[in-house]
């Protein structure tokens, strides 16, 4: 059929020269997460311009309306001026339904699904009909070309890393087999909600965190403390905040801080009675999220925060979200390719909150309750067949920007790349040390990948008690190794001497006053100078932090982490005080924390 169409099309063009712009096309749209104009959609909120593109290498549902809807229409997809696909459009009566048999999206649009291989930068679309000239000869009438705004193609990689705390295990909470990852059906639905080409949700190489205690940082006027059950926390988000801080360290030591790789940690912990304690919420931001183990509304909300999304209602109040009260009033309809149906911006009858929605929801001009964004209490607004509700179309711009600004590692050739949104292409990128090392080196990328490593996490309080200075249990996995500096090596220390070394601002954030010393089973030692200290910002050689002796201040507390090669067994890990560490360390350096293994 495709070959016949191509031959008819080309034959008609050659013989009759009738491929003129005779078809009047009224509207062309493409649907992925949302149904948007073929040229994309742009917002200007208080002179802040945001644009939503079509995601490359992802299937897209094509809709087109014509001046004469009664004709049979075809579309051709072109790439680099080569024809890659003619397709017959389905007539408006065959347009997919709306969730829960809701109002039809359109009665005038012809449509067809485009495979992901055809959705790429540089594609163009043309429509045509095949008629008869009255003399028994075929005549092709064609349209102008349409140029979809296709943007970046990218795969969202997400680690899942369950936290089992205070004696939580497979028997008294949930089995690791259930919490360690997201099954394929959930992944399929998430792809339909997030603006990405593909999604890989994988259990982190560490597999899980299993600790009997947790060191809480100073928070909300409370001092740091060691807790052994969830009832000891001082506020509802305290443990979750601590989990996010741990995840920050893990992303950093694995060399993922500048990547788009996300991490989510289901939190399973026990209360003072040894019973499972539901976290009743979640917390997210900075590519990290934590919450319950069900991978439902809390999960998708927190991973929205992880990609930079704020609460939609608060953003509306600030003028940075376009739709009233964080709703979807004005947002384009959604589309779910898995179910081949449209998702209205109004609550469907089987939604959890449908029954009493008129008491608190915005109402449209047809008397229907308008959905809330996932980022504003929208969980429960979806049809019962779905696990997750919808984001607003505008929120896809934040998600797309999240990926545009990341560094990508190409596993096929061991190189890095970044996206250029002007040329709409990836380009080779070599990581560099920016800002003279102030926030780290090598763009936060590792120097070795996929090797056996120990992840060492630790805490220290400058005011005590001593139990606040801890070396957590070792975590062994397959991971990455960052470039490190050894304070016993004068050549390496010369590189980071403040103001004069090759990386002169390495210690300017808070000083370089701590070293981790690792003793292996062959009695060999490894020293790693930390980019952490006691100093005021930009005072690496002098003033201590103002509140370094205040137990309720974050100035008095440190959480850190490193990865070291696991080619030898570790016997002991120590955290040393090594003031002005670029000067080297003494044989009698103060041991702040120590643990033997």
Curated annotation (Swiss-Prot):
Main location: secreted
Co-factor note (free text): Binds 1 zinc ion per subunit.
Enzyme Commission (EC) number: 3.4.24.-
This protein's record includes keyword Oxidoreductase: no
Database matches in Pfam families: Peptidase_M66
Leader sequence segment: 1-19
Alphabetized UniProt keyword annotations: Hydrolase, Metal-binding, Metalloprotease, Protease, Secreted, Signal, Zinc
UniProt-annotated binding residues for Zn(2+): 301, 305, 311
Cofactor(s) listed: Zn(2+)
Residues of the Peptidase M66 domain: 148-409
Family, per entry: Belongs to the dictomallein family.
PANTHER family (alphabetical): DICTOMALLEIN-1-RELATED, PTHR39540
Protein name as catalogued: Dictomallein-3
Protein source organism: Dictyostelium discoideum (Social amoeba)
Origin organism lineage: Eukaryota, Amoebozoa, Evosea, Eumycetozoa, Dictyostelia
């Amino acid at each position: 059929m495709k070959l016949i169409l191509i031959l008819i099309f080309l034959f008609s063009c050659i013989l009759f020269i009738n491929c003129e712009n005779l078809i009047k096309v009224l509207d062309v749209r493409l649907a992925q997460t949302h149904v948007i104009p073929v040229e994309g959609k742009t917002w200007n909120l208080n002179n802040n311009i945001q644009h939503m593109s079509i995601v490359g290498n992802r299937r897209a549902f094509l809709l087109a309306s014509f001046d004469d809807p009664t004709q049979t229409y075809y579309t051709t997809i072109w790439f680099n001026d080569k024809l890659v696909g003619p397709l017959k459009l389905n007539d408006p009566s065959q347009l997919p339904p709306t969730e829960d048999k809701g109002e039809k999206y359109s009665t005038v649009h012809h449509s067809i699904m485009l495979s992901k291989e055809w959705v790429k930068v540089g594609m163009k679309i043309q429509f045509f009909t095949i008629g008869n000239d009255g003399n028994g000869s075929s005549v092709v009438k064609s349209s102008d070309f349409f140029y979809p705004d296709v943007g970046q193609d990218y795969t969202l990689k997400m680690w899942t890393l369950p936290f089992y705390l205070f004696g939580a295990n497979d028997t008294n909470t949930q089995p690791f087999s259930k919490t360690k990852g997201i099954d394929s059906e959930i992944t399929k639905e998430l792809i339909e909600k997030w603006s990405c080409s593909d999604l890989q949700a994988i259990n982190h190489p560490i597999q899980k965190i299993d600790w009997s205690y947790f060191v809480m940082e100073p928070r909300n006027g409370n001092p740091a403390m060691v807790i052994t059950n969830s009832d000891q926390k001082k506020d509802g988000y305290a443990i979750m905040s601590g989990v996010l801080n741990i995840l920050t360290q893990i992303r950093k030591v694995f060399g993922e801080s500048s990547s788009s790789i996300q991490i989510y940690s289901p939190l399973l912990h026990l209360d003072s009675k040894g019973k499972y304690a539901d976290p009743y919420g979640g917390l997210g931001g900075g590519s990290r999220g934590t919450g319950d183990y069900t991978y439902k509304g809390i999960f998708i909300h927190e991973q929205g925060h992880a990609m930079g999304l704020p609460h939609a209602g608060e953003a509306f109040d600030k003028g940075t979200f376009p739709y009233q009260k964080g709703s979807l009033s004005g947002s384009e309809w959604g589309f779910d390719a898995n179910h081949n149906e449209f998702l209205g911006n109004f609550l469907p009858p089987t939604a959890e909150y449908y029954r009493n929605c008129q008491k608190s929801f915005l109402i449209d001009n047809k008397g229907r309750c308008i959905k809330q964004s996932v980022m504003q209490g929208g969980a429960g607004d979806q049809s019962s067949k779905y696990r997750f509700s919808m984001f607003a179309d505008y929120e896809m711009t934040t998600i797309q920007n999240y990926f545009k600004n990341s560094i990508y590692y190409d596993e096929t050739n061991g190189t890095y790349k970044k996206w250029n949104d002007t040329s709409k292409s990836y380009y080779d990128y070599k990581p560099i040390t920016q800002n003279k090392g102030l926030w780290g080196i090598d763009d936060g990328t590792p120097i070795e990948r996929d090797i056996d490593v120990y992840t060492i996490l630790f805490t220290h309080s400058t005011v005590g008690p001593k139990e606040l200075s801890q070396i957590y249990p070792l975590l062994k996995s397959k991971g990455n190794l960052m470039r490190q500096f050894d304070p016993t090596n004068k050549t390496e220390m010369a590189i980071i001497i403040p103001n004069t070394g090759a990386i002169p601002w390495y210690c300017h954030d808070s000083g370089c006053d701590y070293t981790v010393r690792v003793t292996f089973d062959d009695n060999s030692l490894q020293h790693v100078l930390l980019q952490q200290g006691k100093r005021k910002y930009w005072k690496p050689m002098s003033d201590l932090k103002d509140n370094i002796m205040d137990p309720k201040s974050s100035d008095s507390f440190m959480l850190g982490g490193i990865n070291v090669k696991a080619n030898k067994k570790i016997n002991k890990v120590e955290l040393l005080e090594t003031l002005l560490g670029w000067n080297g360390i003494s044989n009698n350096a103060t041991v702040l924390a120590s643990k033997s293994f």
